Amino acid sequence: MILASVLKAFQGLQTGLQHSYQDGSPSCPINLPLSCGNETAISDLCCFEYPGGILLMTQFWNYAPSKPNLNRTELEEELGPVDSFTIHGLWPDDCMGGYPQFCKRDLFIDDVDYLLKSDAFNNDDTLPIQGEELLNNLNKYWKSNNGNHESLWIHEYNKHGTCLSTLQPQCYSRWNPTTSQKGPKYYKKKAVYDYFRISYDLFQKLNTYEMLAKHNITPSNDTSYTKSEILSALSSEFQGTQAHINCNSQNALTEVWYYHQLNGSILNEDFIPLDPLRSMSRCKDQGIKYYPKGYQRRDNRGPNKKPISRGTIRISQYGGFLIKTGRWMKRGTPANFELIESKYGNYLLKSRMGYCTVHNDKSQLDCSSRSPDYATQFDYNEEKGILGYSGSFEWGAESAPKNGRTSRSVVFAVSNEKNSNLKYKFQLKFNRK
């Protein structure tokens, strides 16, 4: 169990003891364990975050502009303030390091700007921050690498925000008795407002630029740093807990992730620092660059983006390949797949039948979606050439296909909590052409 020695103090559930909050805040048992700290199931998912009980505040350091010779105003409009990291997202990971994604289609949004400008979230003294002020903060500190910042916000909420159990509309009806007449439509919008408000609040508390500067780690065209120097500086400002850093192919710092457990509902904003569950980082031990915003390579290009790759997908251990529907066969012709770098990280996978998805209910692989908007984002380990999903690179099937050309087996993603008992376990090897 995570932090078992600490979490013993939180074990047990005594529902008679309640917090007393003002209207609009959760009223939950005071002695619930931290998220991912329970030893028995907890049914009240308005008070206990599950399955995404590990909350990551992820931040970008985007330094390369789209074109040279931008002035400071133009540079900050594109990349954010020169003396600040920007927000990538607030992600709920499961307790073993995997992560759910695009959980509830009925909660998906296609707009943030209009929602935060609406009367429902302005001119209301009971709100911690007015919607238009929050929107201004997002425009300043939550930047997309493609220039369409709102598209990143929408993506982050649909992919991650809809997976937060304590932000579901049915929870709001419990915490807001005086506004219960507003109903599910209002609560759906309130969850969007709260997701971005809480993300921004946590980002402000974790000022990575200042944390590094306190330890004389500042952006430079020439100076380089060791991984231990950067991690030590962050740890000393993050309650002695480690952060996770990532670099691009030039070994330049690009991201910092902060892991947390959650005490109660996310609406309480009681985040407890946690050491990273993932250790894989592209940053080398030595020679890490921390370039100032506006820096460009001598050939005037920003960091390389991987081109679209084309190839087949082979099954490790048992032999065979994937066909265009995403099923496993042993005889015949393997399908061609495209591995496409997503706008916001990770990869899309596409056959001529359509984009591949992993259905959340059974984690079954299917490649027939016509739209890329909500296609699954896959992990790709370039060194090993294997495909993964939600932090796991293991796949499986209940049965193996026979040698006939019509025999096909359904493929499932495997995680510590799903499909771990499948008879056949393997990896999906992407063979580039």
Swiss-Prot record:
Q: Is Nuclease tagged as a keyword?
A: yes
Query: What catalytic activity is recorded?
Result: a ribonucleotidyl-ribonucleotide-RNA + H2O = a 3'-end 3'-phospho-ribonucleotide-RNA + a 5'-end dephospho-ribonucleoside-RNA + H(+)
Q: Which SUPFAM superfamilies match?
A: Ribonuclease Rh-like
Q: What Gene3D superfamilies does the entry give?
A: Ribonuclease T2-like
Disulfide bond residue pairs: 28-47, 36-95, 46-171, 103-163, 247-283
Q: Which family does it belong to?
A: Belongs to the RNase T2 family.
The protein's name is: Ribonuclease T2-like
Q: Which species does the entry assign this protein to?
A: Candida glabrata (strain ATCC 2001 / BCRC 20586 / JCM 3761 / NBRC 0622 / NRRL Y-65 / CBS 138)
> What is the gene name?
RNY1
